[in-house]
């Protein structure tokens, strides 16, 4: 058993660092009610987010239902696992169920199709507490941020990591030099999980751990794109920037887009223009790389863009948040709109028995006019969500409001119907028990499952 799991905190009081965040999640759980928003615990890996969630569940005697990125997180899968868990009580005797969704910022791609939307719907109907875990809070969808409460976990200080490493050494019967523990804590970069793994790799099979044993178990210190962009605007040494460009997982064309998307951090317009000129020159090398399949040119592209932008910034640094490229956000929004439109066409085609092409070409304008006049009726008839309704009325705020109001009305109707069924009957014969009168007129009803547009 690896030491990370073996020595995972069992109670909130055992969690290292981030005392403010730990206090917030405890107060949230202590006074939890359905009116409270779910929490999103976010921060760098190894800062105690998942461990705090499990420790909280243990302290509160809550059962945990977890989904992470290794699961198939389609809309159907989330509703099957988390949806059922969020509305049903625990069978194990626990007072509540804690629905835990790890790596919530990784809801993308084909495997997570509809996952973010499903989470928002599950949150709206949940009767159990929900916690989401994310590394990058800013990559979450706007809808998900609106229905959750963020709690930040910051990187741990080395002096906070050392006592926990010392406890683990004592429990394992390993004598450790203080210098070795300090070295591990400093190398970990605020990541407790990395520190424990480094200690395990260095101390396994030993009775004494010296400072010289640590270098073989150093943490993978690959740079991130955020660090590279920040270092470029701070004007780090040329050699450091080129080394970081090799370490990041992004290709030079992606790095170029990140730099372009953050040129607003330049101190003035002249510096920004100079930065754009460097990126334009680098873009020529990138284009030649793809045309000629000569990837050696990538190093020239990296040098031109990084050193040029760094020189233009003049060490001004980044004052604000480093943002992903805006074109990625626009492409994502366009892709989402196309997916919503395709899904809506398919839904209406199945309900009305009209081919999708005919719907789009001959009926969509007429349907739009009808929906704009009375959106609530068509939300009920066609089971539209906010994104689908927005395609008709082109007002996202109004679409969201209408869908929420309809959902609330339907919920009230369901409650009244359930109460009516439970009420005792007086044995009075209903008119529905009488056979219908034969008027001799034939009726032409829609075929089963067919909806009508007009």
UniProtKB/Swiss-Prot annotation:
Belongs to the activator 1 small subunits family. RfcL subfamily. SMART domains: AAA (SM00382). InterPro entries: AAA+_ATPase, ATPase_AAA_core, P-loop_NTPase, Rep_factor-C_lsu, RFC_lid. HAMAP family: RfcL (MF_01508). Part of the RFC clamp loader complex which loads the PCNA sliding clamp onto DNA. Heteromultimer composed of small subunits (RfcS) and large subunits (RfcL). Transmembrane segments: none annotated. One of its GO terms (molecular function) is ATP binding. Residues 408-446 have a biased composition (Basic and acidic residues). One of its GO terms (biological process) is DNA replication. Residues 408-454 are annotated as: Disordered. CDD domains: AAA, HLD_clamp_RFC. Keywords: ATP-binding, DNA replication, Nucleotide-binding. It comes from Methanoculleus marisnigri (strain ATCC 35101 / DSM 1498 / JR1). SUPFAM superfamilies: P-loop containing nucleoside triphosphate hydrolases. This is Replication factor C large subunit. ATP binds at residues 43-50. The lineage of its organism: Archaea, Methanobacteriati, Methanobacteriota, Stenosarchaea group, Methanomicrobia.
């Amino acid at each position: 058993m690896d030491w990370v799991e073996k020595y995972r905190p069992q109670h909130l009081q055992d969690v290292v660092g981030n005392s403010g965040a730990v206090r917030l999640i405890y107060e949230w759980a202590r006074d939890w009610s359905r009116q409270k928003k779910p929490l999103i615990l976010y921060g760098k890996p190894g800062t105690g987010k998942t461990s705090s969630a499990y420790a909280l569940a243990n302290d509160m005697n809550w059962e945990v239902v977890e989904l992470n990125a290794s699961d198939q997180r389609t809309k159907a899968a989330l509703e099957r696992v988390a949806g059922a868990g969020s509305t049903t009580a625990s069978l194990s005797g626990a007072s509540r169920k804690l629905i835990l969704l790890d790596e919530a910022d990784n809801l993308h791609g084909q495997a997570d199709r509809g996952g973010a939307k499903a989470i928002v719907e599950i949150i709206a109907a949940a009767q159990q507490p929900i916690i989401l875990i994310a590394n990058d809070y800013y990559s979450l969808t706007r809808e998900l941020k609106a229905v959750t409460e963020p709690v930040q976990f910051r990187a741990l200080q080395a002096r906070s990591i050392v006592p926990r490493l010392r406890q683990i050494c004592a429990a394992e019967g390993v004598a450790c030099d203080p210098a070795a523990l300090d070295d591990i804590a400093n190398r970990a970069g605020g990541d407790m999980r990395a520190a424990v793994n480094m200690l395990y790799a260095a101390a396994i099979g030993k009775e004494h751990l010296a400072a010289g044993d640590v270098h073989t178990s150093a943490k993978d210190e690959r740079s991130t794109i955020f660090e590279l962009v920040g270092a470029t605007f701070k004007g780090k040494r040329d050699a450091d920037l080129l080394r970081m460009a090799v370490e990041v997982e992004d290709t030079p064309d992606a790095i170029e887009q990140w730099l372009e998307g953050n040129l607003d951090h330049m101190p003035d317009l002249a510096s920004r223009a100079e930065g754009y000129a460097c990126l334009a020159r680098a873009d020529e090398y990138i284009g030649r790389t793809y045309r000629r399949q000569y990837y050696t040119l990538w190093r020239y592209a990296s040098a031109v863009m990084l050193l040029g932008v760094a020189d233009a910034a003049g060490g001004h640094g980044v004052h604000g948040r480093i943002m992903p490229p805006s074109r990625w956000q626009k492409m994502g929004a366009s892709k989402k709109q196309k997916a919503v439109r395709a899904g809506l066409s398919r839904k209406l085609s199945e309900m009305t028995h009209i081919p999708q092409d005919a719907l789009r070409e001959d009926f969509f304008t007429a349907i739009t006019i009808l929906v704009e006049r009375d959106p609530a009726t068509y939300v009920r008839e066609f089971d539209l969500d906010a994104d689908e309704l927005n395609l008709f009325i082109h007002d996202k705020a109004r679409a969201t409001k209408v869908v929420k109001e309809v959902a609330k009305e339907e919920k009230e109707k369901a409650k009244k119907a359930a109460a009516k069924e439970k009420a005792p009957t007086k044995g009075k014969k209903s008119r529905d028990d009488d056979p219908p009168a034969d008027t001799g007129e034939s009726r032409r009803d829609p075929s089963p499952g067919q909806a009508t547009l007009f």
